[in-house]
Amino acid sequence: MEELTLKSFEEAAEKVKEATLPTNLVYSEYFSSQTGNRVYLKPENMQYTGAYKVRGAYYKISTMSEEARQKGLITASAGNHAQGVAFAAKKYGVKATVVMPTTTPLIKVNRTKGYGAEVILYGNVYDEACEYAMKLAKEKGLTFVHPLSLIHISEPTRRVVIS
């Protein structure tokens, strides 16, 4: 596994600037008083997709080989990660498939489709959708983009610390 370093964070931060908006830090009087520290909030809901998840997805795609990009990618999500992957894939011209539980709110399904992803509704809960997405990835030779467990996802997500 790759090592997380300040340099890797900085490289990820630079790369995701291509697909994200800068967001300001907002001082929180409430949380500062509750913790005895100066606490600032970073409104990542102001990103194009409404969440920080686009950072990890975009960076992950940037690290994929051209061959892997040609084959496409797949993920499972019921919301923000789905939209982040769809948005990032569209920016790179990569075919994205998103497996979402059948219980996913229609607005999330439609926004994901709106970014160009193929959406497959499968299973009642995330775990079922994820299992199916991993099965399809293996069968079709697609890159599976996990919402949490990859260094490529965590580096740009933690980029918030740098900014």
Model region roles, listed by residue range:
Residues R38-Y40, K95, E118, T143-F144:
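Conserved beta-strand segments of alpha/beta enzyme cores
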Residues L73-L136:
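Active-site-proximal loop->helix
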Residues T23, Y27, L41-P43, T75, ...:
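General beta-strand structural signal in soluble alpha/beta enzymes
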Residues N45-M46, N80, S149-L150:
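Short glycine-rich anion-binding loops that position phosphate/pyrophosphate groups of nucleotides
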Residues I61, G84-A86, S163:
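Generic transmembrane alpha-helix signature in multi-pass membrane proteins
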Residues T35, Y92-V94, K140:
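Helix C-cap/helix->beta junction micro-motif
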Residues E2-K71:
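Positively charged, low-complexity intrinsically disordered leader regions
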Residues I151-S163:
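Single conserved hydrophobic/aromatic residue that forms the stacking wall/gate
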